[in-house]
From Swiss-Prot:
It comes from Aedes aegypti. Disruption phenotype: Salivary gland extracts from mosquitoes with RNAi-mediated knockdown fail to induce migration of NIH 3T3 mouse embryonic fibroblasts. It is a multi-pass membrane protein. The lineage of its organism: Eukaryota, Metazoa, Ecdysozoa, Arthropoda, Hexapoda. Keywords: Disulfide bond, Glycoprotein, Membrane, Transmembrane, Transmembrane helix. GO terms for molecular function: serine-type endopeptidase activity. This is Inactive CLIP domain-containing serine protease A3. The chain crosses the membrane at residues 51-71, 78-98. Residues 223-470 form the Peptidase S1 domain. Probable inactive serine protease. Induces migration of cultured mouse embryonic fibroblasts. (Microbial infection) Promotes dengue virus type 2 replication in the host. Disulfide bonds join C354-C428, C386-C408, C418-C446.
Length: 472
């Protein structure tokens, strides 16, 4: 502030005498004297600002020269510091996109069907520069945009002051995370590892490093700047793998789960009308409050370049109700704690309490879509138990549950996914990491006692997912 006052005084001393002289001359002019006086006054204000800018530049240049001469041992760092200051004052990475609407009705608490959202339109190369090319069981890993360095560490950006509370499993669990690149597949990311020193994270985030390759299914602490969630709501960034699917006009279509930098899995029945390509579909990551104009960390949005629907998908009974969406460009994993991947399951989670999240309706009959991401805990049930429960509904006593296609969870009154949640991930925790065990598929009503919800059994489709991600 003192330097700004100094610059202003310098400019003022240069102009005040000329300014007063011209004003005294204008006072003697008849007719349009007042208009001319306003114009000249406005002109002098602009000239004053320009001179102030020049004087400030000279002032800071003098400081820089003094620092250069007095800080000999730090001279190598000063040019870089100047570049960082310049970038810090000019880079504007976000843009506001309008019109995110929910179909049929208005979101609860959203204030209307058309919502606004702040998105990151680009990712600074100063934030994401490293490429990690590791391996996981079952296949070769797709290079991950993230931070890595010469000590074979992975560094991610977490909320400031929370690195110590970010626990990373060391037992190797969850290494089934799908990341593929083969000699037959051209990847949009160079397959050659580029080992660099991790740069700094964006404002409000700290760089947190752990040994080894990038790991899926990690849940990071809440961002301090985010507002506290209400009962039944997820905290901001709690489910960083969840994707929002948007149709033309930013209409909410459904949800999905990010499983690697280029692929999102979802329920096939949610995107069947988009597969032909006649209607554009987009994927938004890092979403939480769809009614807010901005959030602490901007969301990222991608167009879907390719659709892969399971070849045995049956629209009548929703068997094999799974699809994969190929994104137009790779997601920069590690840049923020609000976007990461979920792990793919390799074991049964029957009897485990898991979580489903989304923006679907809060009631089957008269519910509204939710502006803020909701969550609910549901227990995974055995196929036999699920079939028995569903036979008590209108499905009848002859209903046979396809245990390959489906997994069931829930049955506690008032706890369930509902209309609009299609494709939302059901995730279970194992060893401190989250696995996408199911995708919301169908149900009989919502939240009825002893009637579980039915989800796509993701474990059955891991081989299909693994082979599909390798397709060009």
């Amino acid at each position: 502030m003192q330097s700004e006052n100094y610059c202003g005084l310098l400019a003022l001393r240069l102009l005040v005498s000329y300014h007063l002289k011209i004003h005294s001359q204008l006072d003697g002019i008849n007719g349009n004297a007042f208009s001319i006086k306003i114009i000249v006054t406005h002109l002098f204000k602009r000239i004053t600002r320009c001179i102030s800018f020049v004087m400030c530049a000279i002032y800071y240049l003098q400081l820089y020269i003094k620092a250069w001469s007095s800080m000999k041992r730090y001279r190598k760092s000063l040019p870089a510091l100047g570049v960082l200051i310049l970038l810090g004052t000019t880079w504007t990475p976000v843009h506001t996109y309008a019109q995110i609407g929910f179909p049929d009705d208005k979101p609860a608490g959203g204030g209307g069907g058309d919502l606004t959202r702040q998105l990151a339109t680009n990712v600074s190369t100063g934030i994401i520069t490293g490429i990690l090319n590791g391996t996981v069981p079952l296949q070769t890993a797709l290079p991950i945009l993230g931070f890595t360095n010469s000590t074979n560490q992975t560094c991610v950006c977490v909320p400031s002051g929370r690195c110590a509370t970010t626990t990373v499993p060391t037992d190797g669990s969850g290494m089934i995370d799908v990341r593929i690149v083969t000699s037959q597949t051209s990847s949009p990311i160079s397959p050659t590892p580029n080992i660099v020193t991790p740069p700094t994270c964006a404002a409000g985030l700290d760089r947190c490093c752990y040994p080894g390759p990038f790991q899926c299914g990690l849940q990071y602490p809440a961002v301090a700047a985010a507002k506290a969630p209400a009962a039944g709501q997820a905290y901001y960034g709690e489910y960083p793998w969840q994707a929002v699917l948007l149709g033309p006009g930013d209409i909410y279509v459904g949800s999905g789960a990010l499983i690697d930098p280029l692929n999102v899995i979802t329920a096939a029945h949610r995107i069947s009308e988009y597969v032909s390509g006649a209607r554009a579909l987009r994927v938004r990551l890092g979403e939480w409050d769809a009614s807010a104009a901005s959030e602490p960390i901007p969301a990222l949005e991608y167009t879907v370049s390719k659709f892969f629907v399971h070849p045995s998908y049956n629209a009548a009974n929703l068997q094999n109700d799974i699809a994969m969406l190929r994104l137009s460009s790779a997601v920069p994993l590690g840049a923020t704690p609000t976007i990461t991947t979920a792990c793919l399951p390799a074991t049964s989670f029957v009897g485990t309490t898991c979580w489903v999240s989304g923006w679907g309706k809060n009631d089957f009959v008269s519910g509204s879509y939710q502006a803020i991401q909701k969550k609910v805990d549901v227990a995974v049930r055995s196929p036999a138990d699920c079939q028995t429960a569903l036979r008590t509904t209108r499905l009848g006593s002859t209903f046979v549950l396809d245990a390959t296609s489906f997994v069931c969870a829930g049955g506690e009154a008032g706890k369930d996914a509902c209309t609009g949640d299609g494709g939302s991930p059901l995730v279970c925790s194992l060893g401190g990491r989250y696995f996408v065990v199911g995708l919301v598929a169908w149900g009989i009503g919502c939240g009825t006692s002893n009637i579980p919800g039915v989800y796509v059994n993701v474990a059955s489709y891991v081989p299909w997912i693994t082979s599909t991600v390798s397709l060009a």
